[in-house]
């Protein structure tokens, strides 16, 4: 069997939304390369801008009967509609690859990931022991958040730090559902994951079932329609959407509740911190990993 491999270049701050959009458009899997600029097989030339650190290469795989020109047009349209100002996709091309080539290329990007007590394991991988580890089964590419991205890792680290047994958790922009699954496995009480995309909600439900945890997932635009209050709100999004969420998060966050945000690139950090201050959210800590930032706050009202 053959597949289409879609290859594109984009800025790092569009990496997360593009992965999510590709999944919505029917991608069978997506892989990211940060240090791709030495790959002369795929590209005829490399200029200095192309090789800058803030660019990534995205590979995404589609069934052979897919209209790839339509996929590219729809991808660009969604980016323009929802993320205008963040950039665009560049140097887009696609090619036919055989199933065995796709499978091998795909699996080499997915390995066991250890994040404190959490072990994130692709379904086809085996490890010698999971003793003292909390196992999360997660195949990459289903929707954003397979566990390997720095923003996801930092969110998992913060959940391990702040989540206490029985706490209720709201996961805004749940994507694959990985943060909801991790929260439940860490001992959370009620866990709800919300996402604006219906497909992401369906994928999250399947992942929860695979991990034998009972969670609630709901299609929602940020916190619209959410009535309950939570001990922890976690949001692995992008800076522009976090700014919108900051103005409404206290409505769903308990007094002294913890607010974990991630998906923030360096040049957007100051405006996020200013928004925390403007919305009277006390900043507890700021963490950085590979150019991405996580900001943790507290509701002190």
Swiss-Prot record:
It is an enzyme of class 2 (transferase). NCBIfam families: prmA. Methylates ribosomal protein L11. This is Ribosomal protein L11 methyltransferase. GO terms for molecular function: protein-lysine N-methyltransferase activity. InterPro entries: Ribosomal_L11_MeTrfase_PrmA, Ribosomal_PrmA_MeTrfase, SAM-dependent_MTases_sf. It catalyses: L-lysyl-[protein] + 3 S-adenosyl-L-methionine = N(6),N(6),N(6)-trimethyl-L-lysyl-[protein] + 3 S-adenosyl-L-homocysteine + 3 H(+). Belongs to the methyltransferase superfamily. PrmA family. PANTHER family: ELECTRON TRANSFER FLAVOPROTEIN BETA SUBUNIT LYSINE METHYLTRANSFERASE. It is found in: Cytoplasm. Its main location: cytoplasm. The keyword Hydrolase does not apply.
């Amino acid at each position: 069997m053959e597949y289409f491999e879609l290859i594109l270049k984009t800025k790092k701050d569009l990496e997360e939304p593009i992965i999510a959009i590709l999944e919505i458009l029917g991608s069978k899997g997506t892989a990211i390369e940060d240090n791709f600029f030495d790959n002369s097989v795929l590209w005829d030339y490399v200029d200095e801008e192309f090789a800058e650190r803030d660019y990534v290469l995205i590979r995404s795989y589609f069934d052979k009967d897919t209209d790839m020109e339509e996929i590219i047009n729809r991808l660009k349209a969604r980016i323009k509609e929802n993320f205008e100002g963040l950039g665009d996709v560049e140097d887009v091309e696609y090619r036919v690859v055989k199933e065995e080539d796709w499978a091998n290329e795909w699996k080499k990007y997915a390995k066991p990931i250890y994040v404190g007590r959490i072990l994130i394991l692709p379904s086809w991988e085996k490890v010698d022991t999971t003793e003292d580890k909390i196992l999360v089964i997660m195949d990459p590419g289903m929707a954003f958040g397979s566990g390997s991205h720095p923003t996801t890792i930092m969110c998992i680290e913060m959940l391990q730090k702040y989540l206490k047994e029985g706490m209720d958790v709201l996961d805004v922009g749940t994507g694959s559902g990985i943060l909801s699954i991790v929260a439940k496995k860490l001992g959370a009480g009620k866990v709800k994951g919300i996402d604006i995309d219906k497909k992401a909600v369906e994928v999250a439900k399947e992942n929860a079932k695979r991990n034998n945890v009972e969670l609630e997932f709901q299609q929602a635009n940020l916190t619209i329609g959410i009535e309950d209050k939570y001990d922890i709100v976690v949001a692995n999004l992008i800076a522009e959407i976090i700014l919108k969420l900051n103005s409404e998060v206290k409505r769903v966050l308990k007094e002294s509740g913890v607010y974990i945000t991630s998906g923030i690139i360096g040049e957007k950090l100051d405006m996020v911190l200013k928004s925390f201050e403007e919305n009277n959210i006390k900043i507890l800590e700021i963490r950085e990993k590979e150019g991405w930032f996580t900001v943790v706050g507290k509701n002190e009202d």
